[in-house]
Amino acid sequence: MSFSEKVLICDQVDAVLVDILKKNGLQVSYEPQITPDDLAKKIMDYEIVIVRSRTTITKELIQKTTKCKILARVGVGLDNIDTDAAKAKNIRVINAVEGAMNAVAELVIGRSEEHTSELQSL
């Protein structure tokens, strides 16, 4: 399947994501240092906008969108996207809910082993 939508990536992401999007026919603009002012001028030209935690998608930005279908967060939370404003414009908001699952599991296991060692030395 191939798509023709334009994608704006507003924050630094792994090159693999950019490659996958391009290989599927999406037109990708990778602007990891885009300023809020520049984003306000450009957001209306894109069907998909991808952010991490640096960029905040406000109600004012969402109101400027004319083509946007998806706001995507590469990460767990959605606190930097005004989800109510997106819903009001029928823009789908998605995130990587399970993105940190392995890292959290590794941390928990590591801390458990650390505390087990401490208990054994008592």
Language model segments and positions:
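N-terminal glycine-/charge-rich "phosphate-binding" loop or analogous flexible N-terminal tail
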Residues: 1-46
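Phosphate/diphosphate ligand-binding glycine-rich loop within oxidoreductases
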Residues: 9, 29, 35, 48-119
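Extended, polar beta-sheet/loop recognition surfaces of beta-rich domains
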Residues: 122
